[in-house]
Amino acid sequence: MEQQLSTENNQLSSEEILGLLPHRFPFALIDRVIEHVPGKKAVALKNVTINEPQFQGHFPERPLMPGVLIVEAMAQVGGIIVTQMPDLPKGLFVFAGINNVKFRRPVVPGDQLVITCELLSIKRQRFGKVKGEAHVDGKLVCSGELMFSLVD
């Protein structure tokens, strides 16, 4: 996936995101990128709807977005940063680990996650670390550090 950001205002549509990330339904979790500084930072939106498959079982009487999917959405925003770095080798960067992740509030259908990720480090052009935060209505719902690795 070698597409470079082409919009003047540093936003990406869902179609452009599909050109950058390998994720597809039901794991394409980013709806739109609303701010992007290539190689440094990205801010994206995830609209949480009752139609998502996880809500059939998590939990039918009180649907809550699973924390692992919030973290995965943050990782995908981090992936947007990594895919836009021209000095890195092309290939598949995968989620390799998490540190200090905290869940602070539930996320429910009807919420809009505003996810911000900032690049913390890149090592040997193969490993990366980003700081991620997810907010709903201006309130922090999840934060942590996410690691990436290039798969040969």
Swiss-Prot record:
GO MF annotation, one: (3R)-hydroxyacyl-[acyl-carrier-protein] dehydratase activity
This protein's GO CC annotations: cytoplasm; membrane
Keyword Lipid metabolism: yes
Catalysed transformations (reactions): a (3R)-hydroxyacyl-[ACP] = a (2E)-enoyl-[ACP] + H2O
Catalytic site positions: 58
Catalytic class of the enzyme: lyase
Compartments (UniProt record): Cytoplasm
InterPro entries: FabA_FabZ, FabZ, HotDog_dom_sf
UniProt function note: Involved in unsaturated fatty acids biosynthesis. Catalyzes the dehydration of short chain beta-hydroxyacyl-ACPs and long chain saturated and unsaturated beta-hydroxyacyl-ACPs.
Stated name of the protein: 3-hydroxyacyl-[acyl-carrier-protein] dehydratase FabZ
Organism of origin: Prochlorococcus marinus subsp. pastoris (strain CCMP1986 / NIES-2087 / MED4)
